[in-house]
Amino acid sequence: MELTPTAFVPKPIRIVVIGAGISGIQFLKDVITRLPNVSITVYDKNSQEGGTWAENRYPGCACDIPSHAYQYSWNPNPRWSRLYAEAAEILDYLKSTVTKFDLRRYIQFGTTCTGANWDEKNSEWNVFLQSNGNTNNEISVKCDVFVVAVGRLNNWKLPDIDGLDTFQGRVIHTANWPQGLDYHGKDVAVIGNGASSTQCLASLRK
């Protein structure tokens, strides 16, 4: 009796990752290095990798742990310019990492995930994607493993402060800082005392 080989052939695993920030890059590197017979695609809404370090541009934006602890063990950087590296330097490190290990070919930029659901019958995920700026062109991709690596602070919103809607000046959130904003010579009020406000305040005073 000849046995069918089907049960002994490894099943190709399809993986979809949402987010090409520091976690998405780490996961991608682990998968292509350690797992055989896998296809993986990372989708990111931005035009480049880096996640929060590609988006945050507020004055003084930097990591709040020593730079040498904020890097990949498989791509150490001994040349950080300061103890707490600023956002631009961290982004350069992430981009150079993606280039060095040829990871960009697995990433599709300018694509937003609008939803996902589990297909119980076929035991697979349906992931819904949309090209940025094209709300009429939603596609669905199927995968066996669906990984969300978008971070926790991506969807910012302004606080609910009485009178904010009638304020005559400009209202800016640090997570949506305008590129090239000139704040010199202006009266600036900073609301909050977390990490971003502390970094921002110190730089605004310069």
How would you name each of these model-derived features?
Residues P10-V42, S197-R205:
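N-terminal Rossmann-like FAD-binding beta1-loop-alpha1 element of flavoenzymes
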Residues K45-S96:
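Glycine-rich active-site loop/strand segments that organize a redox cofactor
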Residues Y72, P76-W80, E86, I90, ...:
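Glycine-rich dinucleotide-binding loop and its adjacent helix/turn
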Residues M1-I15, T33-V38, S123, I139, ...:
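Extreme N-terminal leader/targeting segments of oxidoreductases
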Residues R14, D144, K186:
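Conserved acidic residues
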Residues T41, Y106-G110, I172-H173:
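General small-molecule cofactor/ligand-binding pocket signal
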Residues S81-L153:
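Feature captures the FAD/FMN-dependent oxidoreductase FAD-binding
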Residues P12, G110, G185:
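Phosphate-coordination loops involved in phosphoryl transfer and adenosine-cofactor binding
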